[in-house]
Amino acid sequence: MPQFDITMAGELNLDLILYGLPQEMPPERELLASNLAITLGSSSAITAHNLATFGSRVGFITRVGRDSLGHTALDRLRGASVDVSRTSQSPSLDTGLTVLLTHGGPRHILTYPGCMAEMSLAHLDLDYLKSARHFHLSSYFLHRALVPQIAELFRELRSAGLTISLDTNDDPADLWQDGIQEALELVDVLMPNEREACKLSGTEDIEAAIEALSTRVSLLVVKRGAKGATAVAGGKSVSVPAISVEIVDPVGAG
């Protein structure tokens, strides 16, 4: 029996969220927030945390700095029973941090990558990652040192019998290159949102994007916001509407 249900390698940071900022934010003015939250951030860490909370055995490899941000983030994962025993520490870079500014409309999301950008294949214990049924990767484009090696990593894990899922998240450079098309050929489950699906397939038509991507992976799940989600597998498509809720805070909702 594998040691874990799911292993992951990815970024770890905290989110600093400022609420209630004015809708207009002129420069060089001292603007007041009505509230503040410091929470576990990063797509990879949030996914690991939530999978463990739902009962999955999760092993997570990440990289932190020698700072309180890294210690706090790791403690949040340990509190959810995520195994972080293979975490490495950067001697020179700090743990990353994301600042979210909410001010009545679309949020501003500002990220300092820190040591998440330097994690490479050399920092990963492959035997540890192989000790699972499934491997998940998030935030493809944030892993700057790992990006040229992701296809190699996927091949190594697939050869050990693991299935692979990928949630690309956004590309800050908005180029959507960096070997992503090669990596997609090695993915079993792809989970983009609508914009990401269009970028990955080179079209502005979401239905065309879904059709194109569904031929490349065993299971495609497109997150469609208020419209719910669409899943395609084996040529069959199922769309599920979103549950009607009062939006309190979308941070970390995927």
Model-derived features: positions:
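Conserved phosphate-binding/catalytic region of the ribokinase-like
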Residues: M1-T7, L32, E156, I206-G254
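Conserved phosphate-binding/catalytic loop of the ribokinase/pfkB sugar-kinase fold
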Residues: S85, Q89, L100-R144
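Structural alpha-helical scaffold elements that stabilize or flank donor/cofactor-binding regions
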Residues: D127-Y128, I180-A183, L213
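Conserved beta-alpha-beta core of the PfkB/ribokinase-like small-molecule kinase fold
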Residues: H134-A208, A226-A229
